[in-house]
Amino acid sequence: MSQSPKVGFVSLGCPKALVDSEQIITQLRAEGYEISGTYDGADLVVVNTCGFIDEAVQESLDAIGEALTENGKVIVTGCLGAKSSASGSNLIEEVHPKVLAVTGPHAVGEVMQAVHSHLPKPHDPFVDLVPAAGIKLTPRHYAYLKISEGCNHRCTFCIIPSMRGDLVSRPVAEVMLEAENLFKSGVKELLVISQDTSAYGVDVKYRTGFWNGKPIKTRMTDLVAALGELAAQYGAWVRLHYVYPYPSVDEVIPLMAEGPFKGHVLPYLDVPFQHAHPEVLKRMKRPANAEKVLERVQKWREICPDLTIRSTFIAGFPGETEEQFETLLDFIREAELDRVGCFAYSPVEGATANELDGALPDDVREARRARFMEVAEEVSAQRIQRKVGKTLKVLIDEVSAEGGIGRTAADAPEIDGVVYVEPATKASKRYKVGDFVSVKITGADGHDLWGEV
């Protein structure tokens, strides 16, 4: 074994799982472990899994198998670690009995305990080698900020609460400290994430915390205002994801539209509507008044005309009729959602939706998903064309001889569109990764933009 023990790491799943991985890696580095980029260079391997849908389960099981084959010493964590097999035993231990240990999600302490058992930590922790912002797996100029864990909802298609538990909000001072450290490290964009961002603080009855001597309620609106104030000091962006459409969201829109936080609290909401017909929403155990949702979307845009709304939907949910599906298509057209993703309903092991009557054939579900995306892409293309001729602020993600690739306030990394920026023709217009630049938009397709500095 090398002088400093080395741990390999495989991170799968969503941004929330990515943050879990970042926290584990940060703790490993704080205790003096080195992170190996290869299996054969590691003394053991940690695999952070996803267990949300069947494809993710198989991907995670395959990754564990590969790590066992290539290295032999594997610790497993993440959502799949909390899943049982048909026999009632732990699924991972049943499929891969040679793993050293298995934990559930957001279990940094348990993972570290397992690492210590099989690979004792070095005597010198090298704390000074770990940046205050922690170890990040994202590019240096943007980072995810997880404000809570778990969810109090029991949507029939979802098993997240059974794996990640009920809502647990992080103390507001802890969140603000992490945000400040990230901005100090050079992060230009914070992406606020959780299972349910709008519910932040519900579990602690919105108790008051303190940050730099100032009281801040453990509540979404108050946290967003505090993050906006902090972001303004660093000329940075704050972007909100996984915003459940509670009435409290109405209070956040003005922060995006006016005042000192405009341009820092981005006019962007990621709101998982899932459907628009009240009967389908009722079967999903989601808010079931689509007319009021449409009114609220229109009101949001009256207050903040630049607002970008991203959402996700499920087509072909059990019992969904053609008429109900057409209602969903009408909603997409009327709400003019900017960015939309859609999944054909897929049964998830353990979800109560599996017990609902009216399961639709695979070809019907997939056909409806395709029809949905055709309408959604048409709406998105119409909205994006309106940006041609405008000058927009762009955060540069990549630079090459062919020019740059960046994103506007309307585009989150990896899931939305990008701006292809022409190479700088003058020294005064040169840019690098992490720079904000003003770009005149010269062209657009259904998803992306083109422009010049």
Curated annotation (Swiss-Prot):
A Pfam family of this chain: TRAM_2
GO cellular component: cytosol
All copies of domain TRAM, residue ranges: 385-453
HAMAP family, per the entry: MTTase_RimO (MF_01865)
Key words, A-Z: 4Fe-4S, Cytoplasm, Iron, Iron-sulfur, Metal-binding, S-adenosyl-L-methionine, Transferase
Disulfide bonds: none
Gene Ontology annotations of biological process type: tRNA modification
Bound cofactor: record note: Binds 2 [4Fe-4S] clusters. One cluster is coordinated with 3 cysteines and an exchangeable S-adenosyl-L-methionine.
Protein name: Ribosomal protein uS12 methylthiotransferase RimO
Primary residence: cytoplasm
Originating organism: Burkholderia ambifaria (strain MC40-6)
Protein task: Catalyzes the methylthiolation of an aspartic acid residue of ribosomal protein uS12.
